[in-house]
Amino acid sequence: MMEVMDILRKYSEMADERIRESISDITPETLLRASEHLITAGGKKIRPSLALLSSEAVGGDPGDAAGVAAAIELIHTFSLIHDDIMDDDEIRRGEPAVHVLWGEPMAILAGDVLFSKAFEAVIRNGDSEMVKEALAVVVDSCVKICEGQALDMGFEERLDVTEEEYMEMIYKKTAALIAAATKAGAIMGGGSPQEIAALEDYGRCIGLAFQIHDDYLDVVSDEESLGKPVGSDIAEGKMTLMVVKALERASEKDRERLISILGSGDEKLVAEAIEIFERYGATEYAHAVALDHVRMAKERLEVLEESDAREALAMIADFVLEREH
């Protein structure tokens, strides 16, 4: 059996061809360059690979899901471009963000054109019921991404966010698109209703684990692995599961201290916040929740027939928690 990175490389190369084909006719040249900047900058392309693997795991040809795989990656890229503008982030995938190189107006257009091209990539597969069903899944994921971003922005003004609210936010902002990749891929592969539902659940679970692990790495990893200062989420005041849990469990004194550190921008105080997380088991709790979602994801794969594709999906689920950045 291949290693996870080899699997992702193989399937991402299959998706890349359709992605390039989908955006090749964008004009003028400036818009094309801005649109393809993050696509050519790298990234593991886990989402399109999951779409292709899901099609194969239900007995289909992964090529039948190539349009869906391309659409998912184009939507993901559009969301990154717009997120970087909203968050005023200047670096993405080790490269200057699109809005840094081409300005905000062109970056907005680049995101918009990728969003539009995503739907074109799906409907190029024809107008069969499978295509219509897959298209509906992709459309729904776009709505959820916007809702998730709005929830996340709203959390910046609140300190009473519950775990349930946080999980809803990361489901919509992150996991919904991953679930759409696996569900739409299974649809295009001709999966049964049970197989399609199982793969949607698998995608949702690894999507939630992915985001929680991201938050976890921010406080337990190192600057070299992260490519950014440890605890930068704390310095920026981002709401994470660890923040939610620490605020819920902490003494009044520690709660007030944590609140004063969150969003202060003072990296010197980050270590103190991490100590508060540790004191109340918030870091350990987040890791346990991520582990539980990976376990649930792998359990849902048992609905499928044994195959190399199913094994690859299980390996990717484990990989979500093995990565260091």
UniProtKB/Swiss-Prot annotation:
Enzyme Commission no: 2.5.1.-
Binding site for Mg(2+) 2: D83, D87
Needed cofactors: Mg(2+)
Signal peptide: none
One Gene Ontology term from the biological process aspect of the record: isoprenoid biosynthetic process
Residues holding Mg(2+) 1: D83, D87
Gene Ontology MF, one: prenyltransferase activity
Domain of life: Archaea
Alphabetical UniProt keywords: Cytoplasm, Magnesium, Metal-binding, Transferase
GO cellular component: cytoplasm
Chain positions recorded as isopentenyl diphosphate binding sites: K44, R47, H76, R93
Residues where an all-trans-polyprenyl diphosphate binds: R92, K173, T174, Q211, K228, K238
Co-factor note (free text): Binds 2 Mg(2+) ions per subunit.
Cellular localization per UniProt: Cytoplasm
Similarity comment: family membership: Belongs to the FPP/GGPP synthase family.
PANTHER family: GERANYLGERANYL PYROPHOSPHATE SYNTHASE, SHORT CHAIN ISOPRENYL DIPHOSPHATE SYNTHASE
Subunit structure as annotated in this protein's UniProt entry: Homodimer.
Entry protein name: Short chain isoprenyl diphosphate synthase
Organism: Methanothermobacter thermautotrophicus (strain ATCC 29096 / DSM 1053 / JCM 10044 / NBRC 100330 / Delta H) (Methanobacterium thermoautotrophicum)
